[in-house]
Amino acid sequence: MALKQFNPTSPGQRGLVLIDRSELHKGRPEKKLVEGLTKSGGRGGNGRIAVRFRGGGAKRLYRLVDFKRRKQGVATVVRLEYDPNRTAFIALIKYQADGELAYILAPQRLKAGDEVVTAEKVDVKPGNASPLRTLPIGTIIHNIELKPAKGGQIARSAGAYAQLVGRDAGYAQIRLNSGELRMVLDTCMATVGAVSNPDHMNQNLGKAGRSRHMGRRPHVRGVAMNPVDHPHGGGEGRTSGGRHPVTPAGKPTKGAKTRVNKATDKFIIRSRHKAKKGR
């Protein structure tokens, strides 16, 4: 979908660039496939801030998206919809065998009336899903499982995709957008194509209020705070913080590695950090 640019008829319109969603469904979502969503305000289970600068925003219903794609058969795309809970669009599909409805992530170039297939072996068409062991090498894929039957975890955001580059000894090798090359079991499911809404990154909301509608609060710099609030806070007059950049908890930020799961290091053939250095 294209971008919509607005004339500067008011300060809030100046510079405004939004996604043109005129081709999406304009009604309410499928009632059986939504449930209520309680806002957390960025707080965790103990009531403390877990993610800063979150809170408020418009009410949402959570769409129950099928990330597993384990139901075999042919389904017809009923319509494409906006989903406030993610950057990608979603597609309402209807299985031809029993009429069951489901939401899936909408890939690029998928439209109402198209057919999507979930099977052991499928054609390389956007929206079709199958295990990695049967997809041709070089296929562009998204919604990739890390563990069989757990549901897709990789490449689910707007415009995201990965590429299947090889297979060896029961594992598939996939190259991610970050440059990382990693192995996953070839029994894991993946969906053909790249995720919809690639222009999401080119939006300009134009004013702070639109960010607030999305539940984002102002992002305050540490050097603008008091010492009690942040390690960079305080000082007479404007300061640069006086130390290497850290988080509010005092841990290094700006590029410090945070990965701690050494058990899965063996599945990463080439780190995304090495990929960047090699360019």
UniProtKB/Swiss-Prot annotation:
Residues 269-279 have a biased composition (Basic residues). GO terms for biological process: cytoplasmic translation. It comes from the Bacteria. The keyword Cell inner membrane does not apply. GO terms for molecular function: rRNA binding; structural constituent of ribosome; transferase activity. PROSITE patterns: RIBOSOMAL_L2. InterPro entries: NA-bd_OB-fold (IPR012340), Rib_uL2_dom2 (IPR014722), Ribosomal_uL2 (IPR002171), Ribosomal_uL2_bac/org-type (IPR005880), Ribosomal_uL2_C (IPR022669), Ribosomal_uL2_CS (IPR022671), Ribosomal_uL2_dom3 (IPR014726), Ribosomal_uL2_RNA-bd_dom (IPR022666). Keywords: Ribonucleoprotein, Ribosomal protein, RNA-binding, rRNA-binding. NCBIfam families: rplB_bact (TIGR01171). One of the primary rRNA binding proteins. Required for association of the 30S and 50S subunits to form the 70S ribosome, for tRNA binding and peptide bond formation. It has been suggested to have peptidyltransferase activity; this is somewhat controversial. Makes several contacts with the 16S rRNA in the 70S ribosome. Belongs to the universal ribosomal protein uL2 family. This is Large ribosomal subunit protein uL2. The lineage of its organism: Bacteria, Pseudomonadati, Pseudomonadota, Alphaproteobacteria, Caulobacterales. The gene is rplB.
